[in-house]
C-alpha cells in the first residue's frame, strides 16, 4: 500500500462536467503512461493546460470544451477545443502525431481512446467507450480508463442528440486537471452520494446479479432517496433518483418464477416513480418531461382511482403550460371523474375551461370582424 502523500504509478486526471448548465459530477481517469507514454502525456497535459497556447492560437486545454458527439451504446467524443464540432483540435506536439502502439484492446466500456481521421492522425480529440468496441482494435490507440464518475459518462451517453450526433444539451468540461497525492490515491474509490446511495446510477454498470428481487430492492431504495431529496427541496436530485429507479425496473428482470407479490410491487413502483417524476418535473417547470412521465404512469394497470387522478391532474397541468388547452381539458376532466371532491382539480379544470371559452370568443369576434 502506498504511503500517505504518495501518488499512484499511473497519472490520474479529472473532468468536472455540467449538462445544460447544471453540474452533474466528476469523471476521474487513469492514464496508461507505462504502455503509451506519448499519448498519455498528451491527454494529461491537455487536462492541466500546462503547455500554454497552441499553433491555433487557442489554449492547449480541455477546460471549456464540450462532448460534441454522442452515440448511445457506443461512445462519447470530445476534445475539440478549437472548433467544438469535431473538425478541430490540436496535440501538444503540433497539429497531429502518429499512432504510438496498440497494446490494449477495446474489450470493455469506459476506456479512453484517441479519435482520428485515419492512421497517424492523432490530435486532441478522444472518446470514452460505453460498450466493448472490438472493431476499433488496431485503429485507435487506447490510453486510459475511467475510474470513477461512470454515471456521469452514462448521463452524457443518454442525452438526446440532434444532427451529427451532437447532444441537444451542452455537455461541458467545466474544469479539468491532474490529481496528485491523496486525491489521486482515492480516485478509484466509489463514494456514496450526498444521500448515501451506494448503487450504480445505471444498471449496466452494476456488478451484482440483477434478478427481480435485486431490481425491486434498488428501485425501492431509489424511490426512498428521491423522497428524501424531494422533502429537502432538492427537486433535481429527487428526480434523478426516481429516474434511476425506473432504469432498473426497465431492465425487465425475469418474473416467470417470481411470486405475484414481487410482480405487483414492481408495477406499483413503476407507477409511483413515473408519477413522482411528473410532480418534480412540474416543480422544475420541465413541462414536456412532466407530460411524458405522467403518460408513462397512466400506462400502468391496476392503479387506484385516486392515484390515476393525480397522474391525469399532473399531465393536465403540464398541458396547460404547453398551451394545449384541449388536452388539458381532457386530462382534468378525467381527473375530476376519478376524484370529484378534489378542489385543486376542480379549480384547474374550471380555469382552463374559462380560458378556452374566452379564447374561442375572441377568435369568433375576430373572424366576424374579418368577414363584415
From Swiss-Prot:
PPIases accelerate the folding of proteins. It catalyzes the cis-trans isomerization of proline imidic peptide bonds in oligopeptides. Disulfide bonds: none annotated. Belongs to the cyclophilin-type PPIase family. PPIase D subfamily. Residues 14-178 form the PPIase cyclophilin-type domain. It comes from the Eukaryota. Its main location: cytoplasm. It is an enzyme of class 5 (isomerase). It is found in: Cytoplasm. It catalyses: [protein]-peptidylproline (omega=180) = [protein]-peptidylproline (omega=0). The gene is CPR6. The lineage of its organism: Eukaryota, Fungi, Dikarya, Ascomycota, Pezizomycotina. GO terms for biological process: protein folding. It comes from Gibberella zeae (strain ATCC MYA-4620 / CBS 123657 / FGSC 9075 / NRRL 31084 / PH-1). GO terms for cellular component: cytoplasm; intracellular membrane-bounded organelle. It holds the Pfam family Pro_isomerase. Its EC number is 5.2.1.8. The keyword Repeat applies. Keywords: Cytoplasm, Isomerase, Repeat, Rotamase, TPR repeat. GO terms for molecular function: cyclosporin A binding; peptidyl-prolyl cis-trans isomerase activity. TPR repeats lie at residues 219-252, 271-304, 309-342. PANTHER family: PEPTIDYL-PROLYL CIS-TRANS ISOMERASE, PEPTIDYL-PROLYL CIS-TRANS ISOMERASE D-RELATED. This is Peptidyl-prolyl cis-trans isomerase D. SMART domains: TPR.
Amino acid at each position: 500500500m502506498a504511503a500517505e502523500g504518495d501518488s499512484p504509478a499511473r497519472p490520474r486526471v479529472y473532468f468536472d462536467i455540467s449538462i445544460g448548465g447544471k453540474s452533474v459530477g466528476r469523471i476521474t481517469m487513469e492514464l496508461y503512461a507505462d504502455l503509451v507514454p506519448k499519448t498519455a502525456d498528451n491527454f494529461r497535459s491537455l487536462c492541466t493546460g500546462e503547455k500554454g497556447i497552441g499553433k491555433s492560437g487557442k489554449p492547449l486545454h480541455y477546460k471549456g470544451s464540450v462532448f460534441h458527439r454522442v452515440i448511445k451504446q457506443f461512445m462519447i467524443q470530445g476534445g475539440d477545443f478549437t472548433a467544438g464540432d469535431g473538425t478541430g483540435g490540436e496535440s501538444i506536439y503540433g497539429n497531429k502525431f502518429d499512432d504510438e502502439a496498440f497494446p490494449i484492446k477495446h474489450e470493455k466500456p469506459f476506456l479512453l481512446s484517441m479519435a482520428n481521421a485515419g492512421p497517424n492522425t492523432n490530435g486532441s480529440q478522444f472518446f470514452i467507450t460505453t460498450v466493448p468496441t472490438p472493431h476499433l482494435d488496431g485503429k485507435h490507440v487506447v490510453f486510459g480508463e475511467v475510474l470513477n464518475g461512470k454515471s456521469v459518462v452514462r448521463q452524457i451517453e443518454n442525452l438526446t442528440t440532434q444532427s451529427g450526433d451532437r447532444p441537444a444539451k451542452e455537455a461541458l468540461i467545466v474544469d479539468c486537471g491532474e490529481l496528485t497525492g491523496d486525491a489521486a490515491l482515492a480516485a478509484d474509490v466509489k463514494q456514496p452520494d450526498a444521500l448515501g446511495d451506494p448503487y450504480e446510477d445505471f444498471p449496466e454498470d452494476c456488478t451484482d446479479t440483477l434478478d427481480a428481487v435485486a431490481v425491486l430492492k434498488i428501485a425501492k431504495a431509489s424511490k426512498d432517496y428521491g423522497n428524501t431529496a424531494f422533502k429537502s427541496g432538492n427537486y433535481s436530485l429527487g428526480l434523478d433518483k426516481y429516474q434511476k429507479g425506473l432504469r432498473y425496473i426497465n431492465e425487465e428482470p425475469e418474473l416467470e418464477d417470481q411470486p405475484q407479490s414481487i410482480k405487483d410491487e414492481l408495477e406499483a413502483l413503476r407507477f409511483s416513480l413515473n408519477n413522482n417524476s411528473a410532480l418534480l418535473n412540474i416543480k422544475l417547470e420541465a413541462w414536456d418531461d412532466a407530460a411524458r412521465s405522467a403518460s408513462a404512469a397512466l400506462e400502468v394497470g391496476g392503479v387506484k382511482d385516486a392515484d390515476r387522478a393525480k397522474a391525469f391532474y399532473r399531465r393536465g397541468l403540464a398541458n396547460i403550460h404547453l398551451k394545449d388547452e384541449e388536452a388539458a381539458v381532457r386530462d382534468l376532466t378525467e381527473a375530476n371523474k376519478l376524484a370529484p371532491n378534489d378542489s385543486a382539480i376542480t379549480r384547474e379544470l374550471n380555469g382552463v375551461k374559462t380560458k378556452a371559452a374566452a379564447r374561442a370568443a375572441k377568435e369568433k369576434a375576430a373572424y366576424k370582424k374579418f368577414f363584415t
